Amino acid sequence: MSAVIMQQGDLLLNLYIQPKASRDQIVGLHGDELKVAITAPPIDGKANAHLSKYLAKAFKVPKSDVHILKGELGRHKQVRISPPKNVPAEIATLLE
């Protein structure tokens, strides 16, 4: 399975999340997943909310267009962004 898949105009991301990082960033590939570091702690859904906000900003979409499909309670997540208005360079290279 690929870390980044374009599916009917939507972007499907298989992510590995690193909570409590020093800054928010897309780190790169981590096995067959895309590693994303976020500053929020994994407590009471704060990390998921922060991840959605960060991805919405990176892809220039409303937060309501970022859907966590799998992995609400773990570090391994599958996220759908429908449809992205912008694709960050780190992810665009993985789509080629």
UniProtKB/Swiss-Prot annotation:
Under InterPro entries, the record lists: DUF167 (IPR003746), YggU-like_sf (IPR036591)
One Pfam short name:
DUF167
Any one GO CC term of this protein is:
cytoplasm
Which family does the UniProt entry place this protein in?
Answer: Belongs to the UPF0235 family.
Task: Indicate what this protein is called per its UniProt record.
Answer: UPF0235 protein Shewana3_1191
Q: Which organism is it from?
A: Shewanella sp. (strain ANA-3)
